[in-house]
A protein has these predicted regions:
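Amphipathic alpha-helical polymerization modules
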Residues: 1-129
Length: 129
């Protein structure tokens, strides 16, 4: 696999990672009844492929469904005690993950750009001879 293919596989993994993080952040304030499960955060596990085959998503793991029981008597989903179940998602952790995923995406995109520039320069050398 060439540099563009390897970086492309990294871009795909980063895209899935960013999607999971954005989904987690978007749903972190979703209340559910205490009788049901809380929103489960998604975590992407990546693994290097054999040799130079790039990287791939090994698994998407779901977080804890028990969540955190909080008092919110004004919620239409509250139980008789005024409690709802909230996802156990740490915004600080998700923002840290978001920054790492964004930087990894940018690094892979730069590899693609630099490889294209290098390939174009190599083709230009061949044309001049």
């Amino acid at each position: 696999m060439n540099a563009i293919g390897i970086a492309g596989s990294g871009l795909d993994v980063n895209r899935q990672w960013l999607n999971a993080i954005s989904d987690n952040i978007a749903n972190m304030n979703d209340a559910t009844p205490t009788s049901g499960p809380a929103f489960q955060a998604r975590y992407v596990e990546a693994e290097a492929g054999a040799g130079t085959s790039g990287v791939f998503v090994k698994a998407t793991v779901l977080g804890d469904s028990t969540g955190i029981v909080e008092s919110d008597p004004t919620s239409p989903l509250a139980d008789a005690n005024g409690n709802v179940r909230m996802p156990n998602i740490d915004l600080g952790d998700q923002m840290g993950q978001l920054i790492m995923a964004q930087r990894a995406y940018e690094a892979n995109a730069k590899v693609v750009t630099d490889a294209q520039t290098t390939y174009q320069a190599a083709l230009a050398i061949g044309k001049n001879n």
